[in-house]
């Protein structure tokens, strides 16, 4: 595959890094991680990790792309590091919207200065931030997402997710990120296209306790559809694996629903019920968590329902919301 990046070098890892020490031991100085360390975001010396999943208060933490945007425009990160290492190694695990947008910001840092006032680019960066902070359950106007080219820009990721991980995963991830970057360049140059939202998520279970279990059918736009329908607390089946295991997300749409939809308690209970309880399968932040995207969960959605119902019922009772 020809190299389509010059400022950065995308490095797709075979595993996520366990913590900061693991990352620093494993990669060269002047390296950047994008949602690839099971640890807090930030920087340590000449190592940076843009993330908003582990060890954070979700609603008080920017998306990885917004962190990268500020680091490039205000912090002059790329300008400062390029004299020491070029290309700059950027470690990734997947090619979701936040990672793709972060990679574009790092690779095309010079374009940010030229087009920083571009309303559509600014809108996409800001709207990605809102959606990601809320785990995809931000109340949206679906037509606005289509009209402002958000769905078109990230269509390559949607296609990759719909088809699942293929052989040659690293090439698939790099190609997906490159395609999204190409579309962002087209956006800046007035050549953006249009992609309608066609996701039809299935509600598998609607709890009297105010949460739903939904099957995304492999389409990342499903969560936007669910948010537009007014769902706020969600256990989401992302995919069924060929191994028979599952990938889930657990999302609380409002930080103020902690007393009635306790994500941390739910995740701890799901972890305890796994077939490999000593392997860390479930984790995340206070508002959005899920099962490990590498190993997957052994629990089907009916088992999650049976575990979640008494926890949510008790939480609502203690909060005085059991009758609502």
How would you name each of these model-derived features?
Residues 131-195:
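Long, charge-rich alpha-helical interaction segments
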Residues 2, 21-30, 41-46, 178-324:
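Gly/His-enriched, cation/cofactor- and phosphate-binding structural elements
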Residues 1-59:
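Short, surface-exposed loop/strand segments
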Residues 51, 90-92, 283:
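Divalent metal-coordination and catalytic microenvironments
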Residues 5-11, 29-34, 82-94, 211-215:
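Short hydrophobic beta-strand segments
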Residues 58-151:
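Active-site histidine-anchored catalytic micro-motif
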Residues 34-35, 91, 104, 249-251, ...:
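Residues in well-ordered beta-strands of folded domains
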């Amino acid at each position: 595959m020809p190299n389509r990046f010059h400022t950065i070098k995308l490095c797709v890892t075979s595993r996520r890094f366990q913590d900061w020490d693991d990352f620093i031991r494993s990669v060269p100085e002047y390296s950047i991680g994008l949602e690839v360390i099971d640890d807090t975001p930030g920087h340590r010396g000449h190592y940076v990790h843009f993330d908003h999943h582990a060890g954070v208060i979700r609603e008080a933490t920017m998306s990885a792309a917004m962190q990268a945007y500020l680091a490039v425009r205000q912090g002059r990160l790329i300008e400062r590091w390029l004299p020491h290492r070029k290309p700059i190694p950027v470690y990734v695990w997947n090619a979701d919207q936040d990672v793709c947008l972060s990679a574009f910001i790092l690779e095309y840092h010079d374009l940010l200065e030229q087009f920083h006032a571009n309303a559509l680019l600014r809108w996409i960066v800001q709207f990605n931030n809102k959606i990601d902070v809320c785990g995809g359950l931000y109340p949206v106007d679906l037509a606005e997402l289509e009209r402002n080219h958000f769905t078109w820009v990230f269509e390559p990721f949607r296609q990759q997710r719909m088809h699942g991980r293929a052989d040659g995963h690293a090439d698939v991830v790099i190609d997906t990120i490159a395609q999204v970057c190409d579309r962002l360049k087209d956006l800046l140059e007035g050549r953006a296209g249009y992609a309608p939202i066609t996701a039809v998520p299935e509600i598998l279970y609607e709890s009297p306790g105010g949460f739903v279990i939904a099957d995304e059918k492999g389409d990342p736009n499903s969560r936007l559809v669910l948010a537009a329908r007014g769902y706020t607390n969600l256990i989401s089946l992302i995919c069924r694996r060929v191994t028979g295991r599952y990938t889930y997300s657990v999302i609380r749409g409002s930080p103020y629903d902690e007393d009635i939809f306790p994500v941390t308690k739910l995740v701890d209970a799901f972890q305890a019920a796994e077939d490999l309880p000593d392997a860390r399968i479930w984790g995340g932040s206070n508002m959005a968590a899920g099962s490990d995207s590498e190993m997957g969960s052994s629990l089907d959605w009916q088992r999650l329902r049976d575990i979640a119902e008494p926890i949510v019922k008790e939480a609502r009772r203690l909060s005085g919301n059991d009758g609502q």
